[in-house]
Amino acid sequence: MPCPVLELTQQLIKRPSLSPDDAGCQALIAARLQALGFTIEQMSFGDTLNFWAWRGQGSTLAFAGHTDVVPAGDLQLWDNPPFEPTLCDGMLYGRGAADMKGSLAAMVVAAERFVAQHPQHEGRLAFLITSDEEADAQDGTVKVVDALMARQERLDYCLVGEPSSSRQVGDIVKNGRRGSLTANLVVQGVQGHVAYPHLADNPFHRAMAALKELVETQWDEGNSFFPPTTMQIANIHAGTGSNNVIPGELLVQFNFRFSTELTDVIIRQRVEALLQHHGLRYRIDWSLSGQPFLTARGELVDAAVRAVEHYQELTPRLETTGGTSDGRFIARLGAQVVELGPVNATIHKVNECVSAADLQLLSRMYQRIMEQLIL
C-alpha cells in the first residue's frame, strides 16, 4: 500500500534545495496546504523563500521547518546519488531525508488527515517554513518572526521538526536549547625577527596564559534543565608561514554554548575582564547566534510526551543539548516550543537516511499532538 508520507518525502528529496535555494519544495508543500483551506502568505527576504500558512482561528499550534539542506559533499562516497531518493531495506536514503524533509512530509500528511477528520476544528493550525536554516539563517525564520511580532500575531505552541531522536523515533524531545555566542579575538603584538625577540612582542606567547585560563574556567554549573556552559576554541591563527618571523597578531575564535544561568552580557564582561587582567592589547568582536530558551512542562510538552508514549511504548527524555535551531527565534513570540523529529544518526553525513516506518510513526505523533491541542 502506498505511504503518503514516504511519497512526499521522496518528492522533496528530488528537489536539490541547497541552502538557501528552495528548488520548488515550498511550492509543493504550499499547494498541499492550500488544498486543505490554508491561507498561504509568502514572506520572502533576499534569496530566501519563507511562507506562513494558517487555517482556523483561536489558540494556535504551528509546525515549523526548513526545506534547505547542506551540500552532499563528495558524490563518489554516496552509494546512490544524494538527490535520487532510494528505498533499501526499509530505509530511505537521500540528502535531507532526516534533516528535515521527512519531518516536513510527516507534518503535511498529519495536517491532511487531521483536517479530513476534523474539518471544523476549534483552534488554528499553522505552518512556518523557510529555506534558510542550514546556512546563514539571516533571512529565514528570524525575519518571519520579526514580521509576526510587528503585527502582534498570536502563537501559543510550536513544534519544530528537527531530528531530535537518538536511537528510536521519539526517544528524545527537545524542550529548549542552549544559547550560542562566538568571539573573534585579535591579540596585538609587534612583528619581528625570531633571532631578535627583544625587538618584537610575540602575541602568541603573551596570550597563552589568558587562553589557558579561558579554557579552564568553569562558567557555571548548569541547572536541572541545562548542562554547564561550555567554551571551545574553534580556530586559531598567527604568523606569515615563515619560520623566522614573529607574528604581529594572533587571531582566536571561540564559542560559548551557554545555559540560562548566564546571559551573553555576563559572558562578554567576564571574558573582557580576564583579557584585561592579563594585560593584553586586543580587540574583540562578538556574534550572538541565539539566546537560550526553555519550555517547561505544560500543554505542549505533555502533548508531545503522550503522543510518543501512545505509539512507541516509551517515555521520551526531555533534553536541551545539541546545536541551535530555529526554535530560538520562535520562542521570542512567547510560544511554547518543542522539537520532535526523526533519528539524527546520519544527518549531514554521506548516505543520510531515515526509516520509512519512522516517518509514518512521526506523522501519527504529529496528528495526535494536533488533536490534543486544537480540538
From Swiss-Prot:
Cofactor: Zn(2+); Co(2+)
Catalytic-site annotation from UniProt: 68, 133 (proton acceptor)
Lineage: Bacteria, Pseudomonadati, Pseudomonadota, Gammaproteobacteria, Enterobacterales
Annotated function: Catalyzes the hydrolysis of N-succinyl-L,L-diaminopimelic acid (SDAP), forming succinate and LL-2,6-diaminopimelate (DAP), an intermediate involved in the bacterial biosynthesis of lysine and meso-diaminopimelic acid, an essential component of bacterial cell walls.
InterPro entries in UniProt: ArgE/DapE_CS, Bact_exopeptidase_dim_dom, DapE_proteobac, Peptidase_M20, Peptidase_M20_dimer, Peptidase_M20A
EC number assigned by the record: 3.5.1.18
Provenance organism: Sodalis glossinidius (strain morsitans)
Subunit-structure text: Homodimer.
This protein's name: Succinyl-diaminopimelate desuccinylase
Encoding gene, per UniProt annotation: dapE
Pathway this chain belongs to: Amino-acid biosynthesis; L-lysine biosynthesis via DAP pathway; LL-2,6-diaminopimelate from (S)-tetrahydrodipicolinate (succinylase route): step 3/3
Annotated family: Belongs to the peptidase M20A family. DapE subfamily.
Residues reported to bind Zn(2+) 2: 99, 134, 348
Keywords: Amino-acid biosynthesis, Cobalt, Diaminopimelate biosynthesis, Hydrolase, Lysine biosynthesis, Metal-binding, Zinc
